[in-house]
């Protein structure tokens, strides 16, 4: 009996080797639900585009709201358009599922199966297959996967099979760090069989990062960027805008520069991490819980 790729007991959606993304730098962004992954992903994509890179952002959440600050609307999902043509992919055109957003960022929403049915990994796989068939990924410099919540099951871990670096968005609180630790463990498991490696933590919605840094020191993780809890960031979502389109202010300029700095660092290449995720009890003890 063949051993599952990620160890005994795992249930995985395995990648077709033909779907490997050869030329672009690929990043998968994870984090606790509601932590601001879509805001982070969209502004990071915008920052890459500001550096002159050709960017594709793929939303991997049934809510399909990953790219709406880039496109100013909720675009149809890949699963929606596939259902409309009864899964006859030859009937689809690029413009049916790829939408140009802010500063030329190409936006795709994979969507997901109805609640309680199907597999999100299948949908992500079909999305990548369509993009490959229509040569969208061949023309990209950067691909950003924005992945559902902190779900790292075999299905929603599928983007890790394509990614070069996995990034974790976290706030300076227990729940975020607990989720980040679990995600790091899942990424380490994938790294045994795929090219993906941990890149680090993006601190978000946090005045300070002291708890994140305590976790980093213990686990071997690192903070790549820090975005404070600013009202302008919240308002940008309400305005359906990236941070690069908001009314100028000194605090906004600082956040924009941090996104540009992060994009440049990721493009130049961040060293892979070999972190040591903590057991659950250690997280409680580390952050001061009895």
UniProtKB/Swiss-Prot annotation:
Homodimer. Protochlorophyllide reductase is composed of three subunits; BchL, BchN and BchB. ATP binds at residues 34-39, 63, 204-205, 228-230. Component of the dark-operative protochlorophyllide reductase (DPOR) that uses Mg-ATP and reduced ferredoxin to reduce ring D of protochlorophyllide (Pchlide) to form chlorophyllide a (Chlide). This reaction is light-independent. The L component serves as a unique electron donor to the NB-component of the complex, and binds Mg-ATP. It catalyses: chlorophyllide a + oxidized 2[4Fe-4S]-[ferredoxin] + 2 ADP + 2 phosphate = protochlorophyllide a + reduced 2[4Fe-4S]-[ferredoxin] + 2 ATP + 2 H2O. It comes from the Bacteria. It comes from Rhodospirillum rubrum. Keywords: 4Fe-4S, ATP-binding, Bacteriochlorophyll biosynthesis, Chlorophyll biosynthesis, Iron, Iron-sulfur, Magnesium, Metal-binding, Nucleotide-binding, Oxidoreductase, Photosynthesis. This is Light-independent protochlorophyllide reductase iron-sulfur ATP-binding protein. Binds 1 [4Fe-4S] cluster per dimer. One of its GO terms (molecular function) is oxidoreductase activity, acting on iron-sulfur proteins as donors. It is an enzyme of class 1 (oxidoreductase). GO terms for biological process: light-independent bacteriochlorophyll biosynthetic process; photosynthesis, dark reaction.
